[in-house]
């Protein structure tokens, strides 16, 4: 059964705006693709029902994602009928996508509160999908149906329509910007994003980087800021070994979680934002962390304005760099790209 509620899945699709679409008969390769999507900050992945024993690969992939990437929302694509939809839902599909509109498949998904996105190629089919309870309609094949101009035309008289083009969407800033600014709420991208050449070469880092770029281009096209928010302040205790006491006070007083590191302790609650507490009195470590949507773009933006940064710390799922100059109050400031807290 689905791990996430219907609303959780739909909100994640709306928020991220990119649905990577892929198929691979080798479950170990499929796992590495999911790893790459997750490392890029993606929370949605659509595995397609396109090969023999695809259901077995999908079931193993869902189990892997739940254990390794608990925030990853796995769905199934290329579903054309109700029995297939039911089979995949029973094996953990959180959403179902099809190339065509099928009323019985819609009813099956509705019974289990699983989002269904059927392929539609006309305003009439989109209306029929809405009457069947579809929230996000898949425009397929997007390029052949009419491209971004079709989305804009449909949303004129029907601004409430949520359209996810698939087919004809390139993993480029130009293509993504055109679709999003035309009114698409999300984009399904298959071989242009998870390309056969990169998979065959085992270059999953390149897939990760492409997904990361696409996620940023969606946000940029929506007019979202490159700099997200103040992610956390870094404070220090006034006495030796006092960091633990301070952290425990926050945890006990407010019921927050503690994550103990080598030299600092992070405090966090259910919402976004954290507090970093140094274990020892280190005034020079007091700082402010600024969360960014895209690390490379953020660095380039600051440098273009004459703001220098120190050498970056780069890990698969984390990038950070301190500004060389402190803020007017004397606090150090560092950028942070970290999908787990974005």
Feature map (PLM): residue ranges:
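Catalytic cores of alpha/beta
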Residues: 81-91, 124-132, 170-187
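Glycine-rich phosphate-binding active-site loops on the catalytic face of alpha/beta enzymes
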Residues: 98-105, 138-147, 183-204
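Vicinal oxygen chelate
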Residues: 202, 208, 224-226, 230-240, 279-342
């Amino acid at each position: 059964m689905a791990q996430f509620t219907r609303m959780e899945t739909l909100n994640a699709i709306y928020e991220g705006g990119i649905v990577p679409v892929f198929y691979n008969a080798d479950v170990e390769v499929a796992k590495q693709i999911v790893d790459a999507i997750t490392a890029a900050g993606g929370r949605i992945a659509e595995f397609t029902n396109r090969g023999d024993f695809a259901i077995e690969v999908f079931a193993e992939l869902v189990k892997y994602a739940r254990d390794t990437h608990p925030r990853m929302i796995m769905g199934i694509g290329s579903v054309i009928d109700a029995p297939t939809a039911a089979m995949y839902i029973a094996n953990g599909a959180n959403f179902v996508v099809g190339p065509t509109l099928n009323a019985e498949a819609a009813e099956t998904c509705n019974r289990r509160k699983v989002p269904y996105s059927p392929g539609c190629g006309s305003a009439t089919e989109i209306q029929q999908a809405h009457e069947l309870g579809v929230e996000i309609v898949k425009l397929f094949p997007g390029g052949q149906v009419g491209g971004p101009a079709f989305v804009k035309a449909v949303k004129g008289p029907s601004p409430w329509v949520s359209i996810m083009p698939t087919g004809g969407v390139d993993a480029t800033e130009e293509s993504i910007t055109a679709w999003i600014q035309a009114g698409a709420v999300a984009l399904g991208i298959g071989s242009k994003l998870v390309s056969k050449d990169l998979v065959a070469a085992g270059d999953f880092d390149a897939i990760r980087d492409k997904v990361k770029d696409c996620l940023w281009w969606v946000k940029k096209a929506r007019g979202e800021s490159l700099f997200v928010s103040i992610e956390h302040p870094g404070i220090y205790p006034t006495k030796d070994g006092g960091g633990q006491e301070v952290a425990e006070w926050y945890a006990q007083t407010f019921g927050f979680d503690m994550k103990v590191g080598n030299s600092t302790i992070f405090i966090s609650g259910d919402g976004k934002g954290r507090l970093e507490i140094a274990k020892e009195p280190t005034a020079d470590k007091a700082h402010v962390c600024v969360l960014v949507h895209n690390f490379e773009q953020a660095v380039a933006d600051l440098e273009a304005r004459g703001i220098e940064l120190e050498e970056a710390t780069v890990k698969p799922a984390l990038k950070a760099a301190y500004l060389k100059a402190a803020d007017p109050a004397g606090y150090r400031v560092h950028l942070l790209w970290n999908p787990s807290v974005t």
